[in-house]
């Protein structure tokens, strides 16, 4: 059984267990309430204690049943379609200055693309008519960053950036932001020395993302390193830290330059980066075992696959050869 199938089984198991626990609690609590109505416990003096206990059991059971249903459904539900128009500002307020920023932010897109998947019928109908349709709810409240704007925030979710850094990364200050960015960057540098096949379960990791639709044709895992996940997270945390006010614009520009130069030196093309990113992401996911792990994986694989292949993706018309040519064109000492 592949890792992907194991994750799906784990989610289904968790969902079923939660449903059963909830059902038992509802039956017991409901039974106590019915018995009270039938005066089976009329001799009990402090009936209010029984009422409270019964009500708590029923409420707890309903919550567990709902949670179990959500987990169960997430493992079986289909993935939404990417709305790439949400990654592009029609009129950038803070235009990017050079190819270093352009390509570093495109690397951030490997994560951002998983935040723009939607499956409501009205939006999908609009997307069919306009491949760059900007779904209104996402424009106002979505979490994704625009890739063609230095600041990136195009909606009303700016206030959530700090809470996102705090809840997911324990980043609450400039010092913590810089420490985390440095740690991720070190992870990417170390990952550059290790091939995908160096993972003890490399074949299982690769099989899982291929099962979910990633095309690894004509790519040699032995020649691709594992830096992808940390590399993408480096620029993601850096961009969020800048918007949160934890780092300065020049720091983000320096990080963008490093990320772009590293990518140009370590990956032949976008497909190799996507391959590295997904395999190293799954290695992390398997060890972290968060709730909804299988749903997270299938969404990430689909989003990255579409980001790499769709003609309306921000990646369309770009190449790492172009990025390497940019660095080669810089004056001696600047490249």
Model region roles, listed by residue range:
Residues 43:
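Membrane-interface catalytic loops of GT-C/OST-like multi-pass glycosylation enzymes that act
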Residues 21-29:
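Alpha-helical transmembrane segments
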Residues 3-13, 17-21, 35-40, 50-236, ...:
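Polar/charged low-complexity regulatory segments
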Residues 46-47:
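Non-cytosolic membrane-interface motifs at loop->transmembrane helix junctions
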